[in-house]
Amino acid sequence: MSIQPSEVAASSARTDTREALGIEESAFDCVSITVASPETIRKWSKGEVKNPETINYRTFKPEPGGLFCQKIFGPVRDYECACGKYKRIKYKDVVCDRCGVEVTIARVRRERMGHIELAVPVAHIWFLKSMPSRLGLLLDMTARSLERVIYYENYMVIDPGKTPLEPHQLLTDTEYRQAIDEYGEDSFVAKMGAEAVRDALVKTDLEATVAELQEQMRATKSKQIKKKLSKRLKVIQGFIHSKSRPEWMVLEVLPVIPPDLRPLVPLEGGRFATSDLNDLYRRVINRNNRLRNLMQLKTPDVIIHNEKRMLQEAVDALFDNGRHGRPVTGAGNRPLKSLSDMLKGKQGRFRQNLLGKRVDYSGRSVIVIGPELKLHQCGLPKKMALVLFEPFIIRRLKELGFVHTVRGARKMIEKKSPEVWDILEEVTKGHPVLLNRAPTLHRLSIQAFEPVLIEGEAIRVHPLVCTAYNADFDGDQMAVHVPLSLEAIMECKLLMMATSNIFSPSSGKPILTPSQDIVLGAYYLTVEPRKKPAKDERVPLLSGLQEVLYAVADGAMKKHDWVEVPNPDHGRETIFGNKEKKVLRTTVGRVIFNQIWPAGLGFVNFPVPKSKLGDLILNTHKLTGNQATVETLDRLKELGFTTAMQAGISIGIDDMIIPEAKKDIVAETRKKIAEVEAQFNKGIITEGERKNKVIDLWTGTTDRIAKEVFAKLESNEGRNEVNPVYIMMDSGARGNKQQVRQLCGTRGLMAKPSGEIIERPILSSFREGLTVLEYFISTHGARKGLADTALKTADAGYLTRKLCDVAMDVIIAEDDCGSRDGVWKKAIFEGDDEIVSLRERIVGRFSSDDVFNPINPSEILVGSGELITEEIATRVDELGIERVKVMSPLTSTAQHGIDGKSYGINPATGKVAKVGDSVGIIAAQSIGEPGTQLTMRTFHIGGVASGGFKTPEIKVRASGTVRYRGLRLVETADGGSIVLNKTGTIQIVDAEEKELETYNIVVGSFLHVGDGEQIQKGAILAQWDPYNIPVLSEKGGTLAFKDMIPGVTVKRELDESSGRIATVVIEHKEDLNPQIEIRDPKGKPLAAYSIPVGAQIAVNEGDIIQPGALLAKTPRQASKTKDITGGLPRVAELFEARRPKDAAEMSRIDGIVSFEGTVRGKRKLVVKNDDTAQEEEHLIATGKHIIVQPGDVVHKGQHLTEGAADPHEILEILGPSALYDFLISQVQEVYRLQGVAINDKHIEIIIRQMLRKVRITDPGDTENFWGEQVDRAQFLAENRRIEEAGGKPAEAEPILLGITKASLETESFISAASFQETTRVLTDASTLGKVDMLKGFKENVIMGHLIPAGTGLPKYKNLKITLPFGADLPVEPEQPAPAATETA
């Protein structure tokens, strides 16, 4: 296979000088890969390797003609031939007349290749075995039959002549002999082995085959055949385009790679360490030579065939050991590493040497905290700095004339003479270094700092950057890298300095937020004192900050004393200040706390926990910009540490106060549980209901005890000081409510490793100590937690890698692509609570359409293509606008990457994204980085995790008129009504019939308000049984059971504990459908109800019932509901676009449901639309629970059965925009559960990449085939081209690819090969003759170029400033200095 850099003509002299200056990268702009012809291989080669020997064991010199021969591959020593006749550089390029070695540098042994002339052709295993087999596609044979030919089991007919044999027909030995006897020896040609395959390929006329295949394509209607034909077409057209011949896939000449790439190293004791490739080559040469000799000796066919097969197998092992048959093993039964293994996997050439390299000028050491540092500094041990900055020191020593040679300078440095230390100080001043902490999960894991030289061995880190690095000081290590070139230093100073990374790129929240001690100090200063002054009690009035500080220093006042000071914000607008009062009543601590913040914030007169500190920092940045914020942060750090130290807060066991009420609460719960057990014993409720009720009771109890605990801690039993446990928890410095509850209250319910909840809660707290049984129960959860953590870290890393790979090439390509399409954003509700407001979702995006003020329609709030600022977003939210369409990466039409407007504001900078920003990588990191925090939460409900119990009622949020929509009701005896279907909704409308609220109504809900009645805000609209899903009857009458066969469709179980018999519907294979029929007195059926699997039947046959009676009930699985798949696996499942196990059936059209019996053991459900006369039928497995009933009106995309939604179906039925909504909301839900904020735009970028392919449904006049997947941008461009030429454009449907698939489908074969399935990607690319245009990141890193993003964009890279000779550079007016160059 040959890979050629496609050369760009460049005059070589100019290139050499520029190359020497390090300006010009190697001059090529694309790389192509094709199948190499035998001529090409011979052209690469410098000679044939005939001898399997490597080096002479006595002289250690390479054997002539062997695998290390100097004549073929070049001299072992620089400028010295093998026999020693010519030595030194003066004989450069002379070929020695005695030993035939060219006198040159030894480095040529890394690039010169040899070759082996094979005695018989040999098939290349990649083209034979890599599925789909390329040889098979070309010859239209199966891989299996090809193998029989290539490994000399069968003959293949190549030219049938006049005989009735078919071309490419396989013949066994006996059949071959019979054919010869029958037709004569010369009447047809049949051969064995790769030779037969080569001859068949030589005879293939590619052009004619293409024409024939296209004809067949037109003729056939079968999708199966079309699929097969388009596969063959693709490969054959690939060969035509790349001007390669298919017979080149069978090798006649084998290339030998340069010897220095498969070295042989002598070890002590006379043994050698060798690369496995030498062994594999040696086998090939041995077998090849033996075969040659045998063929000259007129040996019997059997022996020759065997020898030929062995040669084929030897070459297979060399290319891809283990692909065919048993792998060839070396010493200790270890499979040898073949050429393919050299490329594959983490240790392969791509990932080990091309994408990740070891770096010079770097070191690593343990980190410790550096509270004395400024934000832009880090402490670097002098010993490390001396080594890292050595070249700079040497240069400076020479400049200052201390030494004249590099050796002298090195000696001076080794002696550590005093001048060296001074020069080190000078050299490191203003020269930033990069600090990196593994795992590098997002871009903030590498930041630049100015080094401050320190004694000792450990690197010192500023405490505020610990959050970004996720570092702590329990032995973490960090690596230091020194940027060398001027450009690198500038980028570090301007872009990577810790001071310019205040905000998190994933959510735009400050990431430099203080934690632990600093938070504790700040909270301690601002906390509300215990004693409130009485109503008319006088409080000292001081003149301001200075006087307060005097009073504190004097000991006259304490930090928590009330004091009155003049209000600095009187009469001016500030963010937190009070504009009205002239005198503020506050505490001494708060006066001190306020001195560090900028005046525009106003006087902060409330306690400041961690979350409020974040707000203060955000607002400081808005008011004063970057530099002032950085200075404020440093002041906050100083103040926090000092205060925390002076406060001397520590916790003792007595501070964990156990509430007295705990006993009574537990006793009360036990009483309630006894009642539940009694109900169960009488048989009123089922086992499942009993369990759920008990668990709900205990969850409620735990919450009540927790409330008591917090109340107790807050009041601190009437002591004067604030409880230290409470301070730590409330300030957010350490510990959360859950942990404190377990210390002082109860541990609560625990989960088994399977995720089920154990019914008996742990009632003791850690303060009281656990009993043996309780301790044992709690070990379950703890151990599972540890095992999960270990397993999940690898998964999170892998997810990040896949996301990076798929989104890598998304950069901002232009400022505006001109498209004004977009996606709708609306607020997110959970139940009745708004969790994410519309404002949060649209701020920082560009609006697609004009947004009008609903109250005054002539006013445009924001125009189309304009930025939605915070002010506008707040306005939109306040005016009650439901949804806004914003521009999105999903709808951007930019050719490569996306445009700045569709991305909006870059969360890390707060400014609109610039051309060249690598937003794809940022998106992948933002989603992957929190992945490590997403524990595999096995229990979302119960466990020590959380108790999620939704109240079984709907309260309305707005007053208005009730309107029923699509509800089927039945009146009950007491005049209320009960809902019978799952698909109905109730709307609340205002006087103008404008919809205010919509509620989905649960089946079995009891409605309190009639259709068209008025309802007040907060009134209860509907209630339902939280434990069961009922099956209710619409009609009254006598009951008859159908298909209820004990032991087949239903089982009667005796409930041990309650002693009653229950009838439950069970899973069944037969064509049966358990139903309850309702008949009128004459025995005519009025209605029939299918009873789902798992339901308990609540009536007996022959009963006479009223409308609305309960026929059966299915327990709602409450205790494991949320845990379908949680956390990380769920995110991976969504991004991989996997089809769920039992996906819900979705209606494909709007229409009315009807059932039409059973077909092949499945129920047939038909949706008919009378207006359009469409009908769609669905076959539904009997075990599945159908949630619609005959006669229901369903909408397109509505679920007909229970189950999870399938993203592919959503795309197919409802189109892309519904899919966007689905995926964004599902991914966000997982992260929200963990309290992680991620901006929607990151998820949108990944989804854009998953949807970038379309599948051709009709090729029209384009060159595409039916069923081919092509890039959306390519597809549109090709169609435009065809339309301009007046042809028929192609048609296609969007398809959703999982991120792994999408990564492998990139345009660039280099990028795909370095991701996964290397051999398959390269095989594919070479047969299609692909050309890599080096547009993306990975391929450029691999080729050693700058990446085409940020400062590496061609438009910046090739920037030239032209000025008349002697002119000065234009000087920009003075700007305030950026924070990065802040003086210490």
UniProtKB/Swiss-Prot annotation:
SUPFAM superfamilies: beta and beta-prime subunits of DNA dependent RNA-polymerase. HAMAP family: RNApol_bact_RpoC (MF_01322). Its cofactor is Mg(2+); Zn(2+). Its EC number is 2.7.7.6. The gene is rpoC. The keyword Oxidoreductase does not apply. This is DNA-directed RNA polymerase subunit beta'. GO terms for biological process: DNA-templated transcription. Keywords: DNA-directed RNA polymerase, Magnesium, Metal-binding, Nucleotidyltransferase, Transcription, Transferase, Zinc. Binds 1 Mg(2+) ion per subunit. Binds 1 Zn(2+) ion per subunit; 2 are expected compared to other organisms. Belongs to the RNA polymerase beta' chain family. GO terms for molecular function: DNA binding; DNA-directed RNA polymerase activity; magnesium ion binding; zinc ion binding. It catalyses: RNA(n) + a ribonucleoside 5'-triphosphate = RNA(n+1) + diphosphate. The RNAP catalytic core consists of 2 alpha, 1 beta, 1 beta' and 1 omega subunit. When a sigma factor is associated with the core the holoenzyme is formed, which can initiate transcription. It is an enzyme of class 2 (transferase). One of its GO terms (cellular component) is DNA-directed RNA polymerase complex. Mg(2+) binds at D472, D474, D476.
